[in-house]
Amino acid sequence: MFPRPVLNSRAQAILLPQPPNMLDHRQWPPRLASFPFTKTGMLSRATSVLAGLTAHLWDLGGGAGRRTSKAQRVHPQPSHQRQPPPPQHPGPYQERIWVGGEGWGEVGGLRLSKVGRRDREVGRGLRAPAGRGRAMGGMPRMGTVGDFGQALSSLAWTSTCFQDFCLPSLPGKLPAPLISKQQFLSNSSRSLFN
């Protein structure tokens, strides 16, 4: 597959692939031509590596139909080079979204790419542009299962939902504020925590 060097009486000859004639398809693989060198001291290991890369590029189809310059033509033979492995294209990335709660329940939302939640918030994701994820204040829009699952995992939305919808307020009385560390508890409620 690779050209082999031929020793001449004058100097070392290097075989490099030539561009194929586009009209004559019987000359595939490409013809090999020899170039005599009068000074063999110019050859070094770096130029042999470059020749190997040139031969690899030609084998991969990089030189078909193109003319090579003089700098690319005058290179020594390739030294023990391996052909690079073919590129591996990963398949589509699928991930199931799990929402914790009473037991583990599976929400069947499939995401087809590695786009994080932050990318969706700034408008680079697949779901919606920025600002469309929440329709009514803090409530998520019910368009897709994935958005609803992400809204359930948001602590800010669950606390506002719990205060607004789950705590009944008596007529004429506001609901009691949440207990913080600065508020003092009565004696009866202190005994519950001690």
UniProtKB/Swiss-Prot annotation:
Main location: cytoplasm
Superkingdom of this protein's organism: Eukaryota
Keyword Cytoplasm applies: yes
Region (Disordered) residue spans: 62-93
Expressing tissues: Expressed most abundantly in the brain at protein level. Present in cortex, cerebellum and midbrain. Found in neurons. Elevated expressions detected in Alzheimer brain samples. Also expressed in testis.
Annotated keywords: Cytoplasm
Subcellular location: Cytoplasm
GO cellular component: cytoplasm
Something else known: Originated from non-coding DNA sequences (insertion of repeat elements especially Alu). Seems to exist only in human.
Protein name according to UniProt: Uncharacterized protein C20orf203
Originating species: Homo sapiens (Human)
